[in-house]
Amino acid sequence: MGICDPIHQLGMWDDFNSSFPSTSATMILEVDKCLEDQIPIMEKRLDNETEDTSHGTVGTSNRYEPETSKPVEKVLRRLAQNREAARKSRLRKKAYVQQLENSKLKLIQLEQELERARKQGMCVGGGVDASQLSYSGTASSGTAVFDMEYGHWVEEQTRQTNDLRIALHSQIGEAELRIIVDGYLNHYFDLFRMKATAAKADVLYIMSGMWKTSAERFFMWIGGFRPSELLKVLTPHLELLTEQQLREVCNLTQSCQQAEDALSQGMVKLHQILAEAVAAGRLGEGNYTLPQMGPAIEKLEDLVRFVNQADHLRQETLQQMSRILNTCQAAQGLLALGEYFERLRVLSSQWATRLREPT
């Protein structure tokens, strides 16, 4: 079973005003001025030559006309080409400057959102001691970005769920519905890629489910939903399944359960090994150095692979269900899945409100 391991990089733009050469603009202006000075002279010279030709003999005009007109036309054509090249160069420079400015604004906005998310994380974790804060500060930069991206992901999922609901009620064409279904699936795949990046920054944060609501955390399995359980949730909402489809859904559910059992057994074994590694220190030392905690840290790195494998199983399950079902059935299943998570989030909100009410 493969492991999804995307790599995200964030490039930094250098300051354009301090690095972009200013001489190019001056050169362009000088070329324009030179062209503007030369064109009237050329036009006047052509007028004089035309006047002289009109007063001269016909034989002389016919004799020297090819030699005179060809160089002049060539020069004028070259001057026109130079002016057009200078104009295009100015337009390219203007577009490049605008692109740099837009990139700077986006980068500043991202840094501001990241700083706000980091401050919010510090407020939420205000109950821990200073040593925990100093440790979590090194890992929170990656998880803060994930928190911000996941918040946007939930908002987009809510919008896509509403679009899917409207599409099913309006009975649009199958081709249009397939576009919506594929977009909904890709939205889940984006989440798996986001989680893979965040797990490398702090896998325990992903495993803890602190980025989800309390009701969602209650049903979590290795950093996300259990595929076989969600198949049971959405299958009753599918209409007119054929016998072949029912068999394939049943086989898929059994395959998911077997894969889940294998991963769960591996997690139990990893839990035992990690506990033994942490407890391996001598009694009374009190000085927990990095070499002493090295074996435990290596086991936490193994935990990243478990999270990625679990997400890979979730992605494969969604893809297989999309293959088994027709377009309308797939839309119904994804709508049931989206509304299920919406109900869990509403349940968490209502439960939290109930706890704040006076008894």
Curated annotation (Swiss-Prot):
Subcellular location: Nucleus
Keyword hit for Transcription regulation: yes
Annotated keywords: Activator, Coiled coil, DNA-binding, Nucleus, Transcription, Transcription regulation
This protein's record includes keyword Hydrolase: no
GO molecular function: DNA-binding transcription factor activity; sequence-specific DNA binding
Region named Leucine-zipper: 100-114
Disordered: annotated segments: 44-72
Residue spans of biased composition, Basic and acidic residues class: 44-54
UniProt region (Basic motif), positions on chain: 74-94
Function in brief: Transcriptional activator that binds specifically to the DNA sequence 5'-TGACG-3'. Recognizes ocs elements like the as-1 motif of the cauliflower mosaic virus 35S promoter. Binding to the as-1-like cis elements mediate auxin- and salicylic acid-inducible transcription. Could also bind to the Hex-motif (5'-TGACGTGG-3') another cis-acting element found in plant histone promoters.
Subunit structure: Binds DNA as a dimer.
Protein name, entry field: TGACG-sequence-specific DNA-binding protein TGA-1A
Source organism: Nicotiana tabacum
